[in-house]
Each structure stands twice: as structure tokens, then as C-alpha cells.
């Protein structure tokens, strides 16, 4: 059979499996909290697979190999350091977030922050800020469309419709249970492909001299491709750009679509095992980008030609190396990466509407006399309808951004929130002295600094009179590097949070004692 025929065969099987899991997950939904968090329902191994799959996105199969194809060995820093940053961030933060979130009965990261700082306004502010993740979800849908077009020969409208419809069916049915169950299965498939790619590169498959032959070939094409830093890209052009990779990703695992999975872990005693396994799986998935090095050896600079694209590096490598049926599996791998990130975004976004806005804000004012059972039923219904609304909105956004480079827009959402969360969420998990005003200040300052630097709106000539034109020129040069911008935003967020907290009214001691003593007891019990 042809590549298209095999791709269709695998697609039908994949869609059937995802929908089947959604139907099964629906049976596990007893109330709204099940839909939102699947609290305490999964062990560390399966949840680690699901978490690692959600952390990876369509870029893991397309963008990361493309960077290795274009920039060579300097990109290994990214593949290795970003998973380390993510899981170190989880390790230092999850003690308080998981323990307190379970005690409060939180269903979202915005709700957790509202309870952590005893502020409805904080919850609403973070909820509204989280809406920028719609751009991230739209970007995932676009990645799915690209894969359908390449592997199945579909036009954009059909590709977008199928991607959104599959997501809609299984998430509406099973909520967080469907999210985690499908992500665990998809994570296992992605991990198998990652191990295959790592072995291919390590052995230098089909290249004389093995891995050393890959390095020699890259050096012959361009010596910069084997240098530890690459001056041709702002992502890896200096040791600063390498340093920021791990630190930029520290808050990533606590963004709303990932952080809510921490509450699905079955027991606090499994936390360290969960983090170790998720880090191991995440590191393996990160190494998928190495496939771009082998693709550069096989194809040279052919993917720069008209009609080609470096994003095709890994799919074309599979087509080159393997039988048609096996090459078609890369399409399922990319689709798994897209769906495993997108479904978490859909669930967390629906909870902004159903939980953070309706249950915690509107319902107490509009329906104060509702019983808990009636309220729960309404929240569950709103969760499902919100899922439909979120997907429709993001599909429209994806359609409008189809011919646009969405990386800047996506990173305004992801990088901006990572910068914003560094103070109130990460520092707030380590230091009991963070105040409400400190959290507000850190949240807004980190987000604002990221946007200002990443959008490159500052002009050096504006600052010649005060002698800062050189510093501003450097900041402007760092603008295209989202990791550098995120770290600078995170530094500002943490610094402002600390300074303002030192100068403002602390939270009640009884509240802090309950938060941190319980987290410490939980850690002690798990050791």
C-alpha cells in the first residue's frame, strides 16, 4: 500500500482508540471534580507517561528536529536542558501545590492561587491571563493540520475539522480522565518512537563511521554545525542563550494544562517516583530532536529548497529509512504529540469558565441557595459545553493563523505565563513570606517584561541620552529568543514578588501555618 493508504489505516485505528478511551472515561465521571482533575485516580507510572506526553507538543516531532537540521549539535543543549528545567520546577513546587490543592479541593491552577493568597481577584486575574493559552491550543491545531496535509493529502479545512472533532468527542465524554488515559497511551507510543530515533542517531544508521560519521559529515557541510554554540541563531548564539534554556522552563510544568495533573496522583507517597519517571520519559521525548542531525546527513540542504521545509525533517527521514507502513507511524506520533498537549489545554481552559468563573465567582451570587449536588451538576454541564466553545474558538483562531508564523503569538502565551508564574507560584511554593500584593506585582511584572522584550518594541536610540542604548540593543537582540525573554521575565517576577512582599502586609499566620505545615508533613510521610 501507499504511504497515504497506510496513514489512513493508522489514523482510523488511532481515532477509534481515542474515542473508545473517551467512552470508557465517561463511565468514571461521577461529578464535576472527576471531569476537572481525576483526583487521586492514577499511579505514578501511567501518570508520568501522560504528563511527559502533555509536556511535549507537536514541536517535539516537527520543530525540534527542524532546529537540529538547521543549527546542528548546538541544539542538543535544548533537547537535554529543557526537560531538566521542567521537572526541577515540578520537584520544587509540587509539594505545596499538590498538598494544598488537594486540601482546598482545587480544580485548576488559577483556583489554587486564589486560595493560596486568599483572594478571589487573584483567581480571576490568573484565569483571564490563562486565556492567552488559547493561542497555544490554536498552534497545536495548526500542527495537526500540517501533519494531516503531509501524510493524508487532505486540504486544510478537512484536516482542521478532523483534528478538532476527535478532540471534541473524547474530551467532552471523559474530561480529565479521557485527557490522562489518552495521554498515557499516546505517551507510550511517543516514547517508543523516541527510543527508536535515539538508537538511529547513536548508531549513525546508514552512515559510514556511525555517530562519528554523522559529526564528520556535518562538519564538512558547515563547521558551525558541530560547534557548541551557533552564531547564526539567537537561540544558541552565546553561553547566555544556553544557560537560560533550563531556567526558562522551570515554571512550564505548572501551567494550567499541566499543573492540574498533579492532583490526579493516587498518593503523596508516589510523588518522587512520579517526578523521576516523568523526567526520564520527558528527557527521552526531548531527544527526538536528534533525528534532525541524521536528516541533515541524509538530505544535506535539500529541505531549504522551494516546496520543502525543515519541519519535514523527521517525517522524511522515516520515509527514507523504513518500509512505508512504518514510516506512516510517524504521522501517528506527531498526532499523538499534538493531541496530548491540546486535550490538556482544552480541559484546563474549560475549567476557567466552569470552575473559576461560574462555580467560584458567579454561582455564590446568582444561585446562593443551590444544593451542592445541584451546583455540581451544573458545573459538569458547563464544563462539557465550555469544552465545545473553547474548541470552536480555537479552531477559528487556527484557521485565521494558518498562513501566519504563529511562534511569536504562541510564545506570548506560554513564555508570558511562565514568566508571570515564577514569583507567585514557584517562589510562593518555597517561601511563606509571599504576600498578596507581592504575588500581584510579580504576576503582572513578569508577564509585561516578557512581552516588551520578546516583541522588540524598545529602540536603542530612545536611551542614548541616559547611556542605556547598549543595554537596550542587547535586549533587542535577545528578543527573538523566547527562552531568554522568559528568564528575564522570571527574574523580574521573582525579584518584584520578593521586594513587594517584604514591604507589604503578610498573609494571616494561621493560614500560612496550615499551608506549609501540612506540605511538610506530607513530604515527611513520603520519605
Segment roles from a protein language model:
Residues 1-527:
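Membrane-embedded helix-loop-helix hairpins and adjacent transmembrane boundary segments
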